[in-house]
């Protein structure tokens, strides 16, 4: 198989220099969750598109990695929360290997946050409260889709949705038992700020012996 000629696409020439800000130990919060809150609020205030979008990486029982974009739906001192179908590929991965990595990329701010940690399901009460806050179409979609399973064509999905709309017409939509939330409880959080000459700032928090340890990593 021949490779695409890089001279046509100039992929090797695609680069930018980062010059906006620095990230110094003396300026960050000792608590990485509070530091994340500060950066997240700045991303929201900058009106970035979907600042809560994050890459979620998981690994299957046979060591096959996979990654996808999901939306952060909450965070606190216990961790970072997202919701999905428990029977999806990521759900099956997490049932067998309950560890994950998250990545936030805020290009306009030249910032990245990496998170690694153990994953647990959130409580039924938390999941119920969030499901009931979702738009009605999203609630129906959670029933209509057998996420990650092969489907014949789009019409099948549309027909399922139409049938569900009729079934639950003028009544509340219950939460599917196969749908709910996960919390990634971090043991590592790294903050990355782009700098000139590829000498980026990387500050990494590691949780050890009941406390967070802050270290600078080489770029």
Swiss-Prot record:
Pathway field of the UniProt record reads: Cofactor metabolism; pyridoxal 5'-phosphate salvage; pyridoxal 5'-phosphate from pyridoxamine 5'-phosphate: step 1/1; Cofactor metabolism; pyridoxal 5'-phosphate salvage; pyridoxal 5'-phosphate from pyridoxine 5'-phosphate: step 1/1
Reactions this protein catalyses: pyridoxamine 5'-phosphate + O2 + H2O = pyridoxal 5'-phosphate + H2O2 + NH4(+); pyridoxine 5'-phosphate + O2 = pyridoxal 5'-phosphate + H2O2
- The residues the record assigns to binding FMN are 68-73, 83-84, 89-90, 112, 147-148, 192, 202
Disulphide-bridged cysteine pairs: none
Where is substrate annotated to bind?
A: 15-18, 73, 130, 134, 138, 198-200
Names of required cofactors: FMN
Identify the EC number(s): 1.4.3.5
Task: Give the GO biological process terms.
Answer: pyridoxine biosynthetic process
What keywords tag this UniProt record? Answer: Flavoprotein, FMN, Oxidoreductase, Pyridoxine biosynthesis
Q: What class of enzyme is it?
A: oxidoreductase
**Top-level taxonomic group:** Bacteria
Describe how the cofactor binds.
Binds 1 FMN per subunit.
The cross-references to InterPro entries, in alphabetical order and at most eight, read: Pyridox_Oxase, Pyridox_Oxase_CS, Pyridox_Oxase_N, Pyridoxamine_oxidase_dimer_C, Split_barrel_FMN-bd
For molecular function, the Gene Ontology terms on record are: FMN binding; pyridoxamine phosphate oxidase activity
* HAMAP family registered for this protein in UniProt: PdxH
Annotated function:
Catalyzes the oxidation of either pyridoxine 5'-phosphate (PNP) or pyridoxamine 5'-phosphate (PMP) into pyridoxal 5'-phosphate (PLP).
User: Belongs to which family?
Assistant: Belongs to the pyridoxamine 5'-phosphate oxidase family.
Assembly, in brief, is: Homodimer.
In its UniProt entry, what is this protein called?
Pyridoxine/pyridoxamine 5'-phosphate oxidase
């Amino acid at each position: 198989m021949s490779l695409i000629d890089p001279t046509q696409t100039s992929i090797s020439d695609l680069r930018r220099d980062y010059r906006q800000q620095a990230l110094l130990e003396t300026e960050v919060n000792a608590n990485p969750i509070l530091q994340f809150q500060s950066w997240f609020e700045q991303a929201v205030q900058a009106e970035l598109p979907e600042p809560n979008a994050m890459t979620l990486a998981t690994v299957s029982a046979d060591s096959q990695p996979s990654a996808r974009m999901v939306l952060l739906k909450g965070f606190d001192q216990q961790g970072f929360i997202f919701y999905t179908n428990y029977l999806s590929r990521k759900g099956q991965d997490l049932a067998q290997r309950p560890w994950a990595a998250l990545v936030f990329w805020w290009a306009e701010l030249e910032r990245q946050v990496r998170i690694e940690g153990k994953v647990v399901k959130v409580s039924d009460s938390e999941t119920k409260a969030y499901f009931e806050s979702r738009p009605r179409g999203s609630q129906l979609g959670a029933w209509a889709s057998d996420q990650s399973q092969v489907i014949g064509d789009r019409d099948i999905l549309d027909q399922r949705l139409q049938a569900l709309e009729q079934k639950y017409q003028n009544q509340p939509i219950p939460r599917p038992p196969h749908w709910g939330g996960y919390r990634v409880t971090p043991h590592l959080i790294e903050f990355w700020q782009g700098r000139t000459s590829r000498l980026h700032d990387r500050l990494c928090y590691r949780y050890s012996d009941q406390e967070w340890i802050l270290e600078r990593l080489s770029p």
